[in-house]
Amino acid sequence: TPRTMQSGFRSSLTYAPEEVQDVLNKKIQEEERETLRHSTPVTRQLERDMHANIRYQKNVLKVVSLFSGAGGLDLGVKLAMLSCTGGAENSLTFLADRQNFEKNTKNIDFIYSNDIFPAANVSYTANFGLDVVKDSRDIRQVIEFPDSDLMLGGFPCPGFSAAGPRLLDDPRNFLYIHYIRALTQSKPTFFIAENVKGLMTMARGQVLKQITEYFSAAGYQVVAHLVNARDYGVPQIR
């Protein structure tokens, strides 16, 4: 959580990369201890059963999806895969026939999805099928995340959005730590983390810098890029 400016306070933005990594590792270890402390034998067994149901196919891109919602970001990744294999001009035509769409996206496999909202999980299952292992727990209750090649997630942004109050101390603004915790366990080759434009200007850009440093400290080369949904076939400026 945020700390107030006090005598002797040192902004973590002034830390050396090794110090940032040490701070991040300690924070992740702290969160993992809290997760275990609040778990029970029953919940731990349920998680083991969940992992046992995950299918790992060879020669496909295995995807873990966090804060999944109805799967909009996941669909975008599937369309991106189609753009690579069949050309960008043809990718949207596959949406007209679901059977053809699924046939041409067999080389990408969504193995696990996590979202706390029941309605979102129902929609996600309708969109992506029953083969995806759905986890409806709060991400802070997940002890271990499955291995993956790609991780997706649009972590919550109530304090980052221009459409609502910009609250630095909103606890939901710090769920990105659990996204990074998932990265360190799942060890994907690459990841996509989506958020709102307001994240780039909050606290004069210092929040984005901090988050970027943490993702970098987890062992990834990070590039922040602003896009507009209207440029990708969505009928809205977002």
Q: What is the role of each PLM region?
A:
Residues 110-111:
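Short beta-strand element of Class I
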Residues 99-106, 127, 214-217:
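Short, conserved catalytic or adaptor-binding loops enriched in Gly and charged residues
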Residues 1-101, 114-148:
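S-adenosyl-L-methionine
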Residues 78, 121-125, 129, 141-148, 161-238, ...:
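Class I S-adenosyl-L-methionine
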Residues 63-77, 138, 147-165, 190-196:
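Conserved proline-anchored active-site loop of SAM-dependent methyltransferases
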Residues 75-78, 125-127, 162-164, 202-204:
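Short, solvent-exposed loop/turn and secondary-structure capping segments
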